[in-house]
Amino acid sequence: MVDNQGPLAKDVSLANPPSDSISELSWSPVANHLAMSSWDQTVRIYDVSQSGNGEGQALFNFPAPVLSCTFSPDGAKVLGGATDGSARLMDLVAGKEAQQVAAHDAPVRCVRFFGNPGVRDPIAVTGSWDQTVKYWDLRQDRPLATLQCQERVYAMDLCQNLLVVATAGRLVHVVQLSNADQIYKTVTSPLKHQTRTVTCIPDASGFAIGSTEGRTGFHYVDESKSSLNFTFRCHREMAASKNTQNVYAVNDVSFHPKYYTFSTAGADGTFAFWDKDAHHRLKSFPSVGAPITSTGFNHDGTIFAYAVSYDWSKGFRYNTPEHPTRVVCHPVDDVDCRPKNPVKR
């Protein structure tokens, strides 16, 4: 679906997208480089211009579908986690084949880096369906530490000293990375159905969580801020029959790096921008015609990327060759993301 005149009129689709569902998008923290992992067993990196046009910079092949990808703090490396239980490192400077740097006993669902931009060798963090999170020094073949979770890792994110791990059974493990081998506390998701995504608030004060029930929640780590916790409904529409709603999964939540406002995107093919402090929707956008599986703002918040592809919500039979697969760059109008009453930080 192309919106030639409305709020999506300036959106640009990147050339040569993956041939199968896109599992995750990841922007470089320091440049307009966009990585995407896919079920087609690749990780692709694009150099995106400010206008949203992108040029392929690198393509790395994996031996299995890739479920997650992330940039290193300096933007020079990309880590990918695959269904064969491996995580592989791609060095964009050296340009060599992806090298295995981590291993699990089940698919690697999520990968992140722990380290500041000035750190030469950041720590890789991998979360798996084998119910563990492992920390890796990329110069060694054994994990530095292993965190035993209560269930399979479904989603994971990291910001500053905060690691949040969402598992099966609606559990959420909160880890303070100053004590990375210990779970600081475990909470039950405020949402009643399966977790689809978890994203740290940029100031590391808490996290946002999305589920299959068309609902998003916010939870703060400090219990003195528990009064600020809240949930809200989104990605729903009225059905043809009265008093009935079609409910869609919230597939991703992304934060604007400057304003800390955020986006939600769902299986209904729509995305919206929100103000968490005012509990207010800033801007909604029309459907793009297929599920949105992953999203992300670039490092300065001027470009919003979203992946359109099958999200597996109806099983493998519906993943047909006719299903659209593309990555789109949306130029962000500052007024769409700027809160009406900014909070001093």
UniProtKB/Swiss-Prot annotation:
Pathway(s) where this gene product acts: Secondary metabolite biosynthesis
PROSITE patterns according to UniProt: WD_REPEATS_2, WD_REPEATS_REGION
Residues of the signal peptide: none
Induction notes from the record: Expression is positively regulated by the oxaleimides biosynthesis cluster-specific transcription factor poxB.
Entries under Gene3D superfamilies matching the protein: YVTN repeat-like/Quinoprotein amine dehydrogenase
Pfam families, per database record: WD40
Keywords (A to Z) from UniProt: Repeat, WD repeat
InterPro entries on file: WD40/YVTN_repeat-like_dom_sf (IPR015943), WD40_repeat_dom_sf (IPR036322), WD40_rpt (IPR001680)
Source organism, top-level taxon: Eukaryota
Each WD repeat, start to end: 15-49, 59-100, 101-146, 250-284
Record's function text: WD40 repeat protein; part of the gene cluster that mediates the biosynthesis of oxaleimides, cytotoxic compounds containing an unusual disubstituted succinimide moiety. The first step of the pathway is provided by the HR-PKS poxF that serves in a new mode of collaborative biosynthesis with the PKS-NRPS poxE, by providing the olefin containing amino acid substrate via the synthesis of an ACP-bound dec-4-enoate.
Family indicated by similarity: Belongs to the WD repeat rae1 family.
UniProt-recorded name of the protein: WD40 repeat protein poxJ
Biological source species: Penicillium oxalicum (strain 114-2 / CGMCC 5302) (Penicillium decumbens)
